[in-house]
Swiss-Prot record:
InterPro entries xref list: DNA-dir_RNA_pol_omega, Pol_omega/Rpo6/RPB6, RPB6/omega-like_sf
Swiss-Prot/TrEMBL GO biological process terms: DNA-templated transcription
EC category name: transferase
Catalytic activity, EC: 2.7.7.6
Subunit structure as annotated in this protein's UniProt entry: In cyanobacteria the RNAP catalytic core is composed of 2 alpha, 1 beta, 1 beta', 1 gamma and 1 omega subunit. When a sigma factor is associated with the core the holoenzyme is formed, which can initiate transcription.
Gene: rpoZ
Official protein name in the record: DNA-directed RNA polymerase subunit omega
Amino acid sequence: MLQRFDLDSQDLLFKAESLIVNSTNRYHVTLQIARRAKQARYEEMENLSEETGIKPVLRAILEMSDELNQPEIIGG
C-alpha cells in the first residue's frame, strides 16, 4: 500500500538550491540527481513490497542534501 509523505515544497526548493550553490558545477549536480533518481526507480521496481510513495527525483534531492549537511552519514 502506498504511503503518502507530506513534503514542504519550500523546504525541498531550499535543499535543491543549496545543492546547486555548494557545488562547483551545476551540470554535474544535475547529472548526479538524475542518476540517483534512475537508480532509485530501478530499486523500487525490484522491491515492489517496499514502495516509498515519494518520487525518485525528490528522494534523490533529499538524500543528497542530507549527505551535504550531515557528512557523518557517509562516514566522513
